[in-house]
Amino acid sequence: GVIYGISAFGLANNLRIPRDEAKAFIDNYFEKFPGIRKYMDETIAFAKEHKYVQTLFGRKINTPEIGAKGPRAGFAQRAAINAPIQGSAADVIRRAMVRVPAALEDARLPARMLLQVHDELLFEVPEAAVDDTIAAMRTVMEGAAAPAVHLDVPLTVDAGQGANWAEAH
C-alpha cells in the first residue's frame, strides 16, 4: 500500500497499529527509497499538467480526475501513480500474447494458449511437450518488451505445470 500512496491512517487501520507507528514506517520507507517518492511526485505533477500519464511503451492513460478536490484527489493521485506501472505490465503481457502463436508454430509445439490473467498465461499442453513449451514461452515472455523498450532490469518468468490451474501454482 505504501507505494500506492496509502496514508498513515489507512496503513494503521490495515495493520492494526498506532497511527504514529504507521507514519514512522511510511517516512522510513521513503527515506530508504527516495527514488520512489521522486517518481510519485513527478508522476502526479506530470498528470496534473497533461491530464494523462504514459506507460513505458508510450501508451497514454487519461487522468481526468487528477484535479479533483477532497477524497477524490487522493484516489486520482494514486491512480496516476499506479497506471504507468500496471499499464506497462499490461503492455508487456499483450506483446507476449501476440508473439505466442508464431513461437508455438516455429517450435512445432502442440500447445494451446487458453487464458490470460493479469501477468499470467495459461496453456493446454500434452505432457510430452511441457518442458519445450515452458522454454519457448519463457523466451517469448522475457523478451516481450524488446525491441520497443530496453529494460535495465530483466524480466523473469516463473512457470508451473499441473493437471489444472491450481496445481500449476
Predicted segments, located by residue:
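Conserved catalytic core of nucleotide polymerization and phosphodiester-bond processing enzymes
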Residues: 1-169
